[in-house]
Amino acid sequence: MEVIKAKDFPPNFVWLNTYEPLSLTRLKGYVVVLDFWTYCCINCMHMIGELSRLEHKYRDRPVVFIGVHSAKFFNEQDVKNIEQAIHRYEIEHPVVVDEDMAIWRAYNVNAWPTIVIIDPLGNVVYKRSGEGQSEFIEDVIDVLLDRYTGKVATEPIRYKPSSRDTNNRLYYPGKIALDAEYRYIAITDSNNNRVLIVRLSDGRIIHKIGNGMRGLIDGSIDEARFFRPQGIRWSKDDGIIYIADTENHAIRAIDLDNKKVTTIAGNGRQGYYSKGGYAKDVQLNSPWDLEIDGNKLYVAMAGLHQIWLYSIEDSSISPFAGSGYEGIYDSDLSTAEFAQPSGLSLHRGVLYVADSESSSIRAIDISGRRVKTIVGRDLFVFGYKDGSVYDALLQHPLGVDAYKDSIYVADTYNHAIRAIDINARQIRTIIGRKEGIECRLDDSCTLMLYEPSDVKYNPNDDRLYIADTNNHMIRVYDKESKVLSTMKIVL
């Protein structure tokens, strides 16, 4: 059998989460696990969770996990943005920034995520793409540790893990929702594993739902637990707040009158392909956003590249649109393709979808049961361009909100809020980041958006409310005065 020697890391590449750059020479005697990832990718997010469990298992053994960040999007090539992703996903292992995908090419990688395992002698012994392979990784590590007993390093590598900024009231807020009377805003405070209800008039927190600890626990709003929730919708009929509890792979319901949280779909385990069924028995896959229509709850099932439908009436859930193949393909509901749908908005019988990995806005005609693309072209065609929707470019949009003849878009990786004129078929930038301006938390007048994940229009005050995720803020844009301000949130 041919022995394949591992290629060392280029000497001048940037390293994060470690005191010093690493090399395979330095790591001789260790089992090295390389994770080729890019932080936009839902499968990579899942792999981070799988590797976290293994990291803790082998914490005191000569095993080193290294993230090789090989960026897909322009925005993901920025070191500061990669640092934000490390904080957001609580990555504890070293990460090397793979400039121009040099390490990717050296290892002949062709998909995210890909795992490569290197034995203590520096030979590649395992290479596989895709998620759901933690058991295989574990088996290989155990075999190598056993095979090289007495020949491996005696101490684990010590490195500098990322530390969270505890000075912010919010921590990577994901999505927002307004109540029926536009008096309150609900916020998924994702990395604090909770939901906040805030009064718009004075910014005062009225309810904190969730105790801040990770978990899938129902009960009182003080005892309940979430795990990085994202999507949120406030029912105009009964006041129930629905939550896409993303990393629990579940849908939760918050009853503010009775101060209770209930799981209505999912069982905490990640599922793959399913025809659906009784919602509590069905395994979901990273639900990222929700939209409500009477007794129907639409779910952006990012991990399956589909839109699902939950029936509030009979507690069933099943795929609604999308074949499950990742792509951008317009067709009928069953054969159309989505790519990590992450935002939903229902308007005039059309369900608009922020289809993040295809950098597009899609439209589902509910009665006609067809999918079409409003703006966007392909999985690898993205950028920043206003004008005709046929020529315009987005970059990994996560949020969408339609009102009258406009579709507001949180164009996440362009750090912008865009508006699509449905009739004129034109797109323009409402809020954008100027060239060379850096985010400064001490100066709200010049603070630009930083990977905003959601936007909601409030017709009562003609303002846009924005989940400014990486700035850990809720921003407010007055359309008349064209002033962007920061919402003051107080206890």
Predicted features by range, described:
Residues A186-N191, I241-T246, V299-G303, V353-S356, ...:
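Conserved beta-strand positions in repeat-built beta-propeller and related beta-rich domains
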Residues M1-L24:
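N-terminal "domain-start" segment that seeds a small globular fold
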Residues T154-G174, D202-R228, K260-S286, S316-Q340, ...:
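Gly/Pro-rich loop segments of beta-rich domains
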